[in-house]
Amino acid sequence: MHGLDNEKRIFFYEQEFYAFSNFSSFKLNWRGHDWMTSEHAYHSEKFDDPDLLAQLKNTRSAHDAMKLAYANKNKYRADWDAIKLDVMKKILHAKVAQHPYVKKKLLESSDKELIENSWRDDFWGWGSNQDGANHLGKLWMEVRDEVCANEKQ
């Protein structure tokens, strides 16, 4: 679905759909803790160390949470690579459930391809060459399909 028709795509670094970014300012209650953003919640799943989790909780921005997590890669859970996509999908579902605006924007996206337009990240986004995996966009589309299916029931 990476054709040239931008009418069928939403790049969610753009303001109208920035809610899909994990850096957007939507607080998230995740596993009984309040996190500043979904980015914070996502990185919290990487660690079991209570001191590191406290540091993460006190970071001032999603970017700082990401930097702290990357600086402690040696402390990631052993199974992290195997579970990270599932963790992210659950966090996205939580974000939709907790924020009616996010759900509204997701439903407004209709059947369009959702793309994390990050030139730095070819795993979660589509990268500098626009040939990345776009896993975050794909997960949002899966969540959208599931939300739409539940709405019809």
Where are these regions (language model features)?
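Charged, low-complexity intrinsically disordered segments
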Residues: 1-153
